[in-house]
Amino acid sequence: VLLLAGLIIVNLIVNHLPVKVTQFDFSNAKLYTLTDTTTGILKNLDQDVELYYICEGGKEDDTIQKLLDRYESASSHIKVEQIDPALYPGFTSKYTQEDVANNSVIAVSGDVSKVVNADSMYVESMNYNTYSYVKTGFDGEGMITSAVDYVTAKDICIS
């Protein structure tokens, strides 16, 4: 009984540790490790940023979800919230009039927002054998960091 109680307590403690301590990035491309540039931008944040992950329940993109977890654990100014468009169909219209694809991210700080569509996070190339596009790379970090930088910029030029 004491062993079981001890395991439960250890499990509760581990569940409250930040992602960077409990998960390791063994991918060759370091998909889940934030670059020094992103870490620097997040470290210098002086205002809160909401990252809304627009995704239907059960259709999450594991790569994007883990990346967002890294952002949230890297800065106390970043909060990630998953929004199911089936449950909240009008949510994205607060930030854009365009259609927002599943697995997209909306960065919001104050009155400023920026949509990062899921399609723009992946690099695609034409496979001439099958005449179809295939995913060949991932730049989710670059796109999300750019959005965070945009919504927290002191001077925004809107044309």
Question: How should each PLM-predicted stretch be described?
Answer:
Residues 1-159:
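Short, surface-exposed patches at the edges or C-terminal ends of soluble domains, predominantly
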